[in-house]
């Protein structure tokens, strides 16, 4: 909620300039010292993505507006956010959830296209 910090986070992500005007933001990070070793190492991304989505759902349930902005895998962006937050090298910011009060009700875009749904195998191909 520190305004200088929110402004610095906004500067680190050109697509999220609105962060500077928000009441708060939550930075979701992966701790590489706790990540699975070996072939499952990258599961930290899924763990953090699930946490990010849960934050969005909780904010919505509380009547708040929330936006998921990305950091990782954009090295420059995640590195800059790490500097702003003084994170150790073992902590990688995956996302920033910017939270505030909605200005009004927005209508969801209808992007449903039944032609893009596959059943059993991709594209309705025969097995």
Question: What function would you assign to each model-found segment?
Answer:
Residues 1-127:
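Acidic, surface-exposed loops and disordered segments
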């Amino acid at each position: 909620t520190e305004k200088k910090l929110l402004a610095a986070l906004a500067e680190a992500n050109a697509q999220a300039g609105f962060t500077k005007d928000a009441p708060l933001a939550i930075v979701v990070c992966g701790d590489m010292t706790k990540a699975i070793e070996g072939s499952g190492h990258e599961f930290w991304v899924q763990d953090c993505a699930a946490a990010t989505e849960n934050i969005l759902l909780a904010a919505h349930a509380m009547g708040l507006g929330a936006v998921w902005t990305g950091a990782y895998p954009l090295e420059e962006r995640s590195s800059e956010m790490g500097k702003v937050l003084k994170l150790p090298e073992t902590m990688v910011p995956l996302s920033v959830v910017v939270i505030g009060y909605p200005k009004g009700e927005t209508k969801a875009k209808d992007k449903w296209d039944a032609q893009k749904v596959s059943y059993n195998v991709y594209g309705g191909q025969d097995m």
